[in-house]
Amino acid sequence: MTSINLNLTVAFSLALAGVLIYRSHLMSTLLCLEGMMLSLFVMMALLISHFHMFSTSMAPIILLVFSACEAGVGLALLVKTSNNYGNDYVQNLNLLQC
């Protein structure tokens, strides 16, 4: 495993650990999800260029599009939650509360 692949794997693992550890605030969860998507994007682009699989060269762009959609929906949810409750706690998103 080259150092670039190792660094990207560590970046993905740290972002995943951040999602699991800092899950009380929505903003920190969204930032960690963006880190995961960015490391996946770079990994996919490097693997496609390394193995010369140019028939799947649109896959990183599609992943980037879904990442942008996820960021937009997440930020809209963050704005709506902070307007309603005054904070960005994930526990406010529980739909089973009365």
Swiss-Prot record:
Gene Ontology biological-process entries: ATP synthesis coupled electron transport
InterPro entries the record matches: NADH_UbQ_OxRdtase_chain4L/K, NUOK/Mnh_C1-like
GO MF terms, alphabetically ordered: NADH dehydrogenase (ubiquinone) activity
Catalytic activity: a ubiquinone + NADH + 5 H(+)(in) = a ubiquinol + NAD(+) + 4 H(+)(out)
EC number of this enzyme: 7.1.1.2
Main location: mitochondrion
Keywords: Electron transport, Membrane, Mitochondrion, Mitochondrion inner membrane, NAD, Respiratory chain, Translocase, Transmembrane, Transmembrane helix, Transport, Ubiquinone
Compartments where located: Mitochondrion inner membrane
Listed transmembrane segments: 1-21, 28-48, 59-79
EC main group: translocase
Annotated GO CC locations: mitochondrial inner membrane; respiratory chain complex I
Bilayer disposition of the protein: Multi-pass membrane protein
Leader sequence segment: none
Gene3D superfamilies, A to Z: 1.10.287.3510
Role according to the record: Core subunit of the mitochondrial membrane respiratory chain NADH dehydrogenase (Complex I) which catalyzes electron transfer from NADH through the respiratory chain, using ubiquinone as an electron acceptor. Part of the enzyme membrane arm which is embedded in the lipid bilayer and involved in proton translocation.
Record family assignment: Belongs to the complex I subunit 4L family.
Subunit structure of this chain's protein: Core subunit of respiratory chain NADH dehydrogenase (Complex I) which is composed of 45 different subunits.
Name this protein carries in UniProt: NADH-ubiquinone oxidoreductase chain 4L
Annotated source species: Trichosurus vulpecula
